[in-house]
Amino acid sequence: MNTVKPESIALFCLTPGGVALAKRLAAMLPLTCFTSEKLREEGFIPFDGGFANTARQAFTTYTALIFIGATGIAVRVLAPLVNDKFSDPAVVVIDERGQHVISLLSGHAGGANALTRYLAGMLGADPVITTATDVNEMSALDTLAFQLNARMSDLRTAVKTVNQMLVSHQRVGLWWDAELTEEIGQCDIRGFIPVDDLQRLPELDALICVSLRNDLPELPVLHWKLVPQRVVAGIGCRRDTPFPLLATLLARQLEAQKLDPLALKAIGSVTLKKGEPGLMQLASCCRVPFKTFTAEVLREFEHHFPGSGFVRKTVGVGSVSGPAAWLLSQGQLLGETLREQGVTITLGVSH
């Protein structure tokens, strides 16, 4: 099952027919619609410096772009910007009569194939998808990573190798850690060989292990670990706590729970720490969002955790890391809170 993430989609139309189709789509899906000043209607934004300039700006700021018109126009406008399948946005092209929806760029990792199917279903159109795994009715490793919001230490190499194996009808196994098996039904796993027991592997050419953990056993087959981002960290610290200390303690706390650092999804703290350099650098280094909560919100959950009078006097709540992790994980905490050198770290898991 493909997942569509429609929260940041820009749509471009250049003709009256394109505007009419854009209005149909905008009634069913959150879109930011751009057109010329001449064709502009209520709800549309005029091009800024022309169509090409606006489209190129959107390429770097939206997760997906939809062009209503000729495929060639989209290709010519975006060609100078195309960089990498793992960073470029999804690009989809639709003819102005809504008969064909074409996945043009970032089909798997960017979600263009999923968006194409979704739009085609809405319009009753023909989805045009040309990626080899899809035309052979198989999933792909980058599709699976996209659906799971997962990371891999060498994703680029793995995607190239595994997808080629799949379309060559080689046997690629797929194993899920027990705590993640409920997510299988949300993913397209066509073409993979299900593996239930790492100690009793079937005959395989390669294996993908879906896990949050850092303690997988040695395996007698070419394998990669796909790590969904599910772990959150609530962190409290003194002002000007250095980044190296925060990074060291977070790594230690993750290791204590046998968690792969790639599983980290978000870091949270109190609003007073919103501009804390060490925490901001930590989130940037881990490539995760840094979310903060007001003292008032944290106080609603502080009764679950030991409090500190000093912390309460300083930030307005007796405990920061625990309530922050509770909020980020909806109360699904992992292990004990780390307390060291003025730093507290509480982990949770958010599915």
Predicted regions, residues:
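N-terminal basic/disordered segments at the start of proteins
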Residues: 1-38, 334-343, 347-350
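Conserved mixed alpha/beta catalytic, RNA-binding, or beta-rich assembly cores of soluble enzyme
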Residues: 14, 18-24, 30-31, 39, ...
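N-terminal beta-loop-helix "entrance" segment that forms/cooperates
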Residues: 33-57, 276-277, 301-307
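General beta-strand structural signal in soluble alpha/beta enzymes
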Residues: 33-36, 67-69, 93-94, 127-131, ...
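Short, structured active-site "lid" loops
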Residues: 48-72, 283-290
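N-terminal glycine-rich "phosphate-gripper" loop used for MgATP/nucleotide binding
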Residues: 67-75, 80-83
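C-terminal edge-of-domain segments
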Residues: 204-218, 223-226, 324-351
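C-terminal non-catalytic interaction/assembly regions of soluble proteins
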Residues: 262-323, 329-333, 339-343
